[in-house]
Amino acid sequence: TPGPDTIVFTSDWEPQTSQAIVDRLVDLVSSGSLQPDSYSLGGTVEALEERVASDLGKEAAIWMPTGTLANHLALRRHCGIKSRVVLQEQSHIYHDEGDTLARLSGLNVIPLATDRPYFIADELQVALDQSVDGRVLNPVGVVSIESPVRRQAGQVVPWDEMQAISHLCAEQAIPVHLDGARLYMMSVATGIGIRDYADLFDSVYVSMYKYFGAPFGAVLAGSSEFM
């Protein structure tokens, strides 16, 4: 059985009891290795943000309590006044976040690849064209990709397809966000580095609790201006 310091990249990790979480936190505080932070400035939190940003090859990162919040704020920040978000129909954002993009930020989602793990660049191009060629101009503000896709048994968006989508969006000045909650697991499975994946995206979210064993938390990374 893996211990509390073990990192497992083959699953989402075993659920922890409240007592186990408290005991672990007490041990960490007692060790004297945690540096205090004030309003998220300095200390252990900032060190974590800097480490994740460095590992992903991004300029900056910010810790957040949940991945749902990280995804939401990233998409909202990218969109600005362009209120459309293209994503996978099987994504966590579409199915499991309570329509918060529409409820809280007035963003409208365009789900592609119904009952499939991913869409391809040609499908995306059709959606982008429809957003600008219709009777009312309503351009896409951001494209979001989840990989691995939990609802599709953890299937991974192929590297070539990720590259094609990233290049297509770059040509049209549309930012791309990676819901990389399981990015490290994907990297282990494919042999492609986490930085190589992150390079294709303007922003990346990674989970801190799934395989790292943290009680909760997420980190969102991107450019300094984006943050």
Which role does the model predict for each range below?
Residues 2-227:
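Conserved PLP-enzyme active-site core in the AAT-like
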